[in-house]
Regions:
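Short loop-to-helix capping motifs
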Residues: 122, 206-208
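Hydrophobic alpha-helical transmembrane segments
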Residues: 1-86, 203, 266-267, 271-290
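Alpha-helical transmembrane segments of integral membrane proteins, especially early/N-terminal helices
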Residues: 43-64, 106-107, 143, 147-149, ...
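Terminal transmembrane helical anchor/hairpin motif
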Residues: 1, 65-79, 161-178, 209-212, ...
Length: 290
């Protein structure tokens, strides 16, 4: 044990010198040696194996090391650590609902929707018009925001490598490029869901304040209750559980071989159902003829 302790101390000294020389590759190679000594002493095998796999993955790809797996500074890494988790949160879901989920209810309040009862805007077209226009606008804002963030961070810190391991717990070796693309595509799916659900609520409630109130109760209520024990068996049936693709891959209550496929089909099916119900409900409403 004394010999191992001395070896570890010497390795820490070498690591300190490597950091002073800003040689992160050498620092991490030494970390593998330290980890191997720790394994001999019965320390956390799972954590150490994951850390060693991460280090070897970066070295084998010939990449420059980030400061740490989940404290990356370059664009393609930091975006899935900071920006995407912020976008995939209840606060932003409510912002999406406010910007794109209440347009139909606002038209009811302004009585403007009555003027759409023309051959061009029939029962079906008015619902699809609101859906398509809001999804397009929000998607455009989404892409612009991501582009500015990537370019802005890239300008100051560099863009990094898309094949750098993300370091996400449970899936640490999945590359940043894959995580970023998955988040990007899923964002469009979430936008379509929220807009379609907002239209559904609007044709029944007809008041934008009520629509936002329902959204707030659902999203914030989900955040407050999702970690409660009694919710464990229910989470896999709630659409909000499938809003974040990384949660699908890493959370115990969702992770499965086909989790992402199930999520896509489930949310897509709900979008279609919401639109069909909205169109049917709209046809039962009374309008002033032009």
């Amino acid at each position: 044990m004394i010999t191992d302790a001395q070896k570890t101390l010497n390795l820490y000294t070498k690591q300190s010198k490597a950091l002073k020389n800003n040689n992160l590759t050498e620092y991490n190679k030494l970390q593998i040696e330290i980890n191997n000594l720790s394994l001999k002493n019965g320390q956390n095998k799972k954590y150490i194996d994951e850390q060693n796999s991460y280090i070897r993955n970066v070295i084998n790809k010939g990449l420059s090391f980030e400061n740490s797996p989940r404290a990356q500074l370059r664009s393609f890494g930091i975006i899935n650590e900071i920006l995407f988790p912020l976008i995939f949160s209840s606060l932003f879901y409510l912002i999406i609902a406010l910007l794109g989920g209440v347009s139909v209810s606002t038209e009811f309040e302004n009585e403007g929707i009555k003027l759409y009862k023309t051959p061009l805007f029939n029962d079906k077209n008015i619902i699809l018009y609101h859906f398509a226009s809001n999804v397009f606008t929000l998607s455009l804002c989404y892409i612009i925001a991501l582009s500015f963030y990537i370019v802005g961070v890239g300008f100051f810190n560099g863009f990094g490598a898309i094949n750098y391991p993300s370091g996400i717990p449970s899936i640490p070796l999945v590359e940043n490029g894959i995580v970023d693309i998955l988040y990007l595509i899923w964002g469009f799916l979430v936008i379509m869901f929220i807009v379609s659900f907002g239209i559904l609520l609007s044709v029944f409630l007809r008041k934008s304040l009520l629509v936002i109130g329902v959204f707030s109760i659902i999203f914030l209520g989900y955040d407050l209750l999702k970690n409660q024990e009694f919710m464990t068996s229910l989470l896999k049936y709630l659409p909000m559980s499938y809003f974040n693709p990384i949660d699908i891959l890493t959370k115990d209550y969702l992770s499965s071989k086909y989790g992402l496929i199930i999520g896509v089909f489930y949310i897509s099916a709900l979008i279609i159902v919401f639109l069909l119900i909205s169109i049917r409900k709209y046809r039962t409403l009374s309008f002033r003829k032009i």
